[in-house]
């Protein structure tokens, strides 16, 4: 019980700035949208949100810029994650990108081109962080990687629980090659996923890897033909939904929090979750 209390304290509320949907008075799913048997969509500018029964599909929607992440997209993405957390009808989330790419990184602004990477303010970098909001979602999150996931795009992808990639996808954290530094969890989540050695390899060399290598090192869980990506992702989602909803949440909790605990502490957490 003490461990559960610690876990809940560490979670805490996730602060979210009001995005355009809230400012415009558009209802969130917890206010009534998405509770019926059909599909419901919540309009945003750069993030598409659709709920189909217990599945929420979140799509990065800036295909003309290969879904690069800017301030408004990041704000909307955090806002959508908050909506998902508040809707008890949602049991699983699918995160993907519109068009041929998942996301190739951060939006390049004129001031970035005229100055050094160091000139980008810390406050601005924090304002476009969104990976922690994805990781904080309590239900399983499947990331359907439809093309390249680079830099900030990869940081968003590895914040999910399971990654299904199209066969032509490529992956990389190339910030160091540009004299920059990962800022949305890349240096922390990547080594926890693939191990410190592979993480150092990718980060220090800015090397780009293909889907086959990503599968071999554990960066993605499955690789499928691009034409079958959504179908395979939905099949995987249905297999997860076939199990118990509460059990799935607790299993995710145990695995996620257990990574930061000793084995004995993790076993106690597992036992405590079993009796809730």
Mark where each language-model region is.
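Glycine-rich phosphate-binding loop at the start of an alpha helix
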Residues: 124-128, 151, 184, 208, ...
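Short helix- or helix-capping micro-motifs
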Residues: 104-106, 145, 190, 198-207
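Glycine- (often His-adjacent) and acidic-residue-rich active-site loop
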Residues: 89, 97-133, 149, 179, ...
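C-terminal long alpha-helix characteristic of the crotonase
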Residues: 3, 10-18, 46, 164-169, ...
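Glycine-rich beta-to-alpha active-site loop
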Residues: 128-178, 208
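Conserved CoA-thioester-binding segment of acyl-CoA-metabolizing enzymes
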Residues: 10-98
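Terminal peptide-recognition signature
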Residues: 58, 62, 76-77, 95, ...
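Alpha-helical segments flanking ligand/cofactor-binding loops in enzyme cores
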Residues: 132, 154-155, 188, 200, ...
């Amino acid at each position: 019980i003490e461990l559960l209390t610690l876990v809940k304290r560490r979670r805490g509320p996730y602060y979210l700035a009001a995005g355009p949907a809230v400012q415009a008075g558009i209802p969130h799913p917890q206010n009534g949208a998405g509770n019926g048997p059909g599909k419901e969509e919540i309009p945003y500018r750069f993030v598409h949100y659709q709920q189909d029964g217990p599945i929420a599909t979140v799509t990065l929607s800036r295909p003309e810029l290969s879904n690069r992440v800017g301030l408004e997209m990041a704000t909307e993405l955090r806002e959508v994650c908050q909506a998902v957390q508040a809707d008890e009808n949602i049991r699983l989330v699918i995160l993907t990108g519109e068009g041929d790419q998942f996301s190739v990184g951060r939006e390049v602004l004129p001031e970035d081109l005229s100055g050094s990477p160091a000139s980008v303010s810390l406050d601005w970098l924090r304002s476009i962080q969104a990976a922690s909001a994805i990781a904080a979602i309590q239900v399983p999150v499947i990331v359907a990687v439809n093309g390249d996931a680079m830099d900030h795009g990869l940081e968003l992808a590895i914040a999910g629980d399971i990654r299904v990639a199209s066969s032509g996808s490529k992956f990389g954290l190339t910030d160091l090659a540009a004299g920059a530094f990962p800022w949305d969890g890349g240096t922390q989540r990547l080594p926890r996923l693939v191990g410190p050695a592979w993480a150092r390899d990718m980060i220090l060399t800015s090397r780009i890897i293909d889907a086959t290598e990503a599968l071999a090192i554990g960066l993605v869980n499955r690789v499928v033909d691009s034409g079958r990506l959504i179908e395979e992702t939905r099949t995987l989602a249905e297999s997860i939904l076939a199990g118990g909803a509460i059990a799935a949440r607790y299993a995710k909790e145990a695995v996620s929090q257990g990574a930061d605990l000793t084995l004995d502490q993790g076993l106690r957490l597992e036992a405590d979750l079993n009796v809730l």
